[in-house]
Amino acid sequence: MGMTITEKILAAHAGLKAVEPGQLINAKVDLALGNDITAPLAIQEFKKLGVKKVFDPERVVLVPDHFTPAKDIKSAEQAKILRDFAREQGLTHYFEIGRMGIEHCLLPEAGLVGPGDLVIGADSHTCTYGALGAFATGVGSTDLAAAMATGELWFKVPETILFRYHGKLKPWVGGKDLILYTIGRIGVDGARYMAMEFTGEAITNLSMEGRFTMANMAIEAGGKNGIFPVDEKTVEYIRGRLQRDYRIYQSDPDARYNQEIDIDASKIEPQVALPHLPENARSVKEIGEIKIDQVVIGSCTNGRLEDLRVAAQILKGQKVHPEVRLIVIPGTQQIYAAALAEGLIATFIEAGAAVSTPTCGPCLGGHMGILAKGERALATTNRNFVGRMGHPESEVYLAGPAVAAASAVKGRIAAPEEVVK
């Protein structure tokens, strides 16, 4: 019996010829990631183990991105724990303010993840790297501590759901719309502890930015990981970034899947997920008059250059509605610089937006855009749980950058065609 991409990567890293769903394995990790929320606890647990050095200072990555720049004394102390540990251990990849970016935008850009890798991170959206044909999944801080010490971790081999997306996408439809539609169809637990393998004509034609967005939100369907077959676009993306060898895995024709789901992507409209779950996805055209107070364009889901280009295309020559706050957050310093060079930042500022240094900030209700009681936000982020962006009686709607930009102009949730004719 054949194996899926996910099964092949896990088998290779466990030193086994084959694995099957449900099997418990111990596998070597290529990269272990922590941030300013999760790494302090991992570092504390690491020190309790009595281990003096991490397994490999080039393969432990620390990124202070959630509360950076530090918003208060506590967050400053959290970041200092990372900074001190990185110095003590001689870590190659500690990303300080000025070099920092939102971790899941930053690591692929920096060439730290490649096809066939096994990556664990103490952040649930570590699954983003599946866009590169890697097995990447989120873990807890104690598991991160174990991986930092040993370079290995235990896994239960997941079953895989195969998604095939057929047809050509409509204008303004991107990866965010595909994944919101998918989560709306299968539910937030529809892929619980399963690999989500994305294939089909629409995926072949989807940009790498769109693929990162889809893989990023696999966890929002309960997925263990999201993964894409490596193709020419993948190889082109890593060319000049990844400075080491890698291995490409493809699913066998006779691989076993939990289920196979076919989706006509040509019929998908720009999507909006209503409070308070990502599964509450609707076509933007089905949504009535919903006024908003704030729009956030950015995050590890949609803070890449293509996302900013889409938003700027709609905002060019427009003004943000006087009753709306628009916050734009590029995912990394490199993305910020590229957006500046292309004139995108000027477009945002001229429209009336606030542009921030890279940070997770408002996505988790941390800083840089917290909602007050009764306020509504539309965001290109990945979660809209109760209180996610601030007050428990606020609301968050999820959408892609096109809908977000149009909504910022209209002062209500709006389709891109309402602004760009």
From Swiss-Prot:
Pathway: Amino-acid biosynthesis; L-leucine biosynthesis; L-leucine from 3-methyl-2-oxobutanoate: step 2/4. Disulfide bonds: none annotated. Binds 1 [4Fe-4S] cluster per subunit. GO terms for molecular function: 3-isopropylmalate dehydratase activity; 4 iron, 4 sulfur cluster binding; metal ion binding. Transmembrane segments: none annotated. InterPro entries: Acnase/IPM_dHydase_lsu_aba_1/3, Acoase/IPM_deHydtase_lsu_aba, Aconitase_4Fe-4S_BS, Aconitase_4Fe-4S_dom, HAcnase/IPMdehydase_lsu_prok, Homoacnase/IPMdehydase_lsu, IPM_dehydratase_rel_enz, IPMI_cat. Signal peptide: none annotated. Its cofactor is [4Fe-4S] cluster. The keyword Nucleotide-binding does not apply. [4Fe-4S] cluster binds at residues 300, 360, 363. Its EC number is 4.2.1.33. GO terms for biological process: L-leucine biosynthetic process. Keywords: 4Fe-4S, Amino-acid biosynthesis, Branched-chain amino acid biosynthesis, Iron, Iron-sulfur, Leucine biosynthesis, Lyase, Metal-binding. It catalyses: (2R,3S)-3-isopropylmalate = (2S)-2-isopropylmalate. The keyword Lyase applies. Heterodimer of LeuC and LeuD. Belongs to the aconitase/IPM isomerase family. LeuC type 2 subfamily. This is 3-isopropylmalate dehydratase large subunit. The lineage of its organism: Bacteria, Bacillati, Bacillota, Clostridia, Moorellales.
